[in-house]
């Protein structure tokens, strides 16, 4: 449906809603809002709006809905699939929530915090710590990503094994619908069996059904015991076996199990100028963390004994248990720095895929075979959250082929990897979402019934299709 009024007139009305200091219409100042942090997705917009409160968001959406103006919600713009970047039509308005950044309430007794959507994740974490609690969502981009974006993409991260995805950390939600109406469900209740759990519609829907403006999130006791180790392993099957044994031995104390292959370690050594972790090179590495808020747990001894047992079982070749905070920080820095290092070393295609944990070795091995067949001599890097079945897979352009040749191969590489993933009952998007990058995969790998249900929900909540279309 076409825009019903003079476009410039509508833009002026939108500016009036937020006030003169809360919008950008100068093209020269818009660039940070029109491309993603990896510089892979680019768009255009006539106006960047920065509302100060929910009422402003409501008025913006009501006006846009009435006049069929497309809206792209944006948080920290740290996504990896282009979901917060407008298209190149120059007709989509960006609604950036960065100024809605207040911590509204913290209740240590109830273990909850109420926040606005524009709060930076690291600030939420730090505020929780001041109240002697933690908010466990942890991402490499936590210094710039915003809680609203985390929830609308159902972010994962390094603590999913113990605490779950973002949507499992939410009790209540406020969201503005496409027509400007406000759904206020900011309940701080762990038990509330009064009809449909409507907040789930907005968690993971990437701003396509409305804009999350506030949330009640869960807090947890600060772990009083924490121990971290880097473990070297010769084969993938032993990596999975190690995870199984550690979970059996530690119960609920294992809080992270991150994976990096040898290629990842090599590129970190090369790019960061650091020493190798062990005297000998190994094919696979696991970053393991145990944590507990129970004061009488001796996690150091538990982890050391568990690893020693797996050395005897030939599932572990070597290990270092961190003896101080400096070592802990170094180990985690390796894993968290890796994506940023990889994005700077050449042209690549990347995957965010998941399968049942027991099938991870089959996925990784078969994916490497396919990549080598399609694109010989390519550099492949595999890392991720093996503890929850999520792998990140980077394949780089070989030196002997041109960028154009590599770009022509990308589609075949993607479809081959996604086909393998689908055959293993996996997902082509484990934690990064759909965005712009994976629209075609959504149509191809999702059943007709599921697609039709999504369309029914979208049509019901956003009949004019203005929300992040």
Predicted regions and their residues:
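Short, ordered loop/turn segments at secondary-structure junctions
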Residues: 28, 75-77, 140, 262, ...
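Short beta-alpha connecting loops at secondary-structure transitions
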Residues: 108-111, 401-402, 437-443
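Activity-critical C-terminal alpha-helical subdomain
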Residues: 181, 438-469
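N-terminal flexible segment immediately upstream of the FAD-binding catalytic core
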Residues: 1-62, 79-111, 264-275, 325-352, ...
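C-terminal substrate-recognition/cap domain of FAD-linked oxidoreductases
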Residues: 24-31, 230-233, 238-412, 416, ...
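FAD-binding subdomain of flavoenzyme oxidoreductases
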Residues: 102-258
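N-terminal accessory segments
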Residues: 1-37, 66-69, 310-326, 423-428, ...
């Amino acid at each position: 449906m076409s825009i019903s009024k003079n476009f410039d007139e509508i833009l002026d009305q939108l500016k009036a809603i937020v006030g003169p200091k809360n919008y950008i219409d100068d093209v020269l100042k818009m660039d940070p809002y029109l491309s993603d942090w990896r510089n892979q997705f680019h768009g255009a917009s006539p106006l960047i709006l920065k509302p100060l409160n929910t009422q402003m968001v409501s008025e913006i959406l009501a006006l846009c809905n009435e006049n069929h103006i497309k809206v792209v919600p944006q948080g920290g713009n740290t996504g990896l699939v282009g979901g917060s970047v407008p298209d190149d039509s120059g007709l989509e308005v960006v609604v950036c929530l960065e100024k809605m950044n207040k911590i509204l309430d913290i209740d240590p007794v109830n273990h909850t915090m109420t926040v606005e959507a524009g709060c930076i994740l690291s600030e939420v974490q730090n505020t929780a710590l001041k109240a002697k609690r933690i908010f466990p969502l942890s991402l490499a981009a936590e210094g710039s990503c915003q809680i609203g974006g985390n929830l609308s993409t159902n972010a994962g991260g390094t603590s999913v094994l113990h605490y779950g995805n973002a949507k499992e950390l939410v009790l209540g939600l406020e969201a503005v619908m496409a027509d400007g109406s406000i759904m206020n469900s900011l309940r701080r209740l762990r038990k509330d069996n009064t009809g449909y759990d409507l907040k789930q519609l907005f968690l993971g829907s990437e701003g396509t059904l409305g804009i999350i403006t506030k949330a009640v999130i869960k807090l947890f006791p600060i772990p009083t015991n924490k121990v971290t180790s880097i473990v070297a392993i010769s084969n993938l099957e032993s990596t999975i076996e190690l995870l199984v044994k550690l979970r059996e031995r530690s119960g609920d104390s294992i809080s992270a199990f991150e994976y990096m292959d040898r290629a990842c370690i090599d590129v970190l050594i090369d790019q960061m100028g650091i020493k190798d972790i062990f005297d000998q090179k190994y094919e696979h590495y696991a970053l393991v963390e145990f944590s507990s808020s129970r004061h009488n747990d001796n996690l150091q001894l538990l982890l050391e004994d568990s690893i020693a047992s797996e050395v005897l079982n030939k599932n572990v070749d070597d290990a270092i248990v961190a003896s101080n905070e400096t070592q802990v920080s170094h180990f985690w820095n390796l894993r968290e720095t890796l994506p940023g290092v990889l994005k700077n070393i050449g042209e690549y295609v990347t995957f965010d895929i998941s399968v049942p944990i027991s099938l991870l070795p089959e996925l990784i091995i078969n994916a490497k075979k396919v990549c080598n067949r399609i694109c010989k001599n390519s550099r492949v890097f595999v890392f991720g959250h093996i503890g929850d079945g999520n792998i990140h897979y980077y394949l780089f352009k070989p030196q002997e082929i041109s960028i154009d040749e590599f770009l022509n191969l990308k589609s075949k590489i993607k479809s081959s990897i996604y086909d393998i993933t689908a055959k293993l009952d996996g997902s082509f998007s484990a934690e990064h979402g759909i965005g712009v990058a994976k629209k075609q995969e959504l149509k191809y790998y999702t059943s007709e019934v599921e697609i039709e249900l999504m369309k029914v929900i979208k049509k019901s909540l956003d009949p004019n299709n203005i929300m992040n279309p």
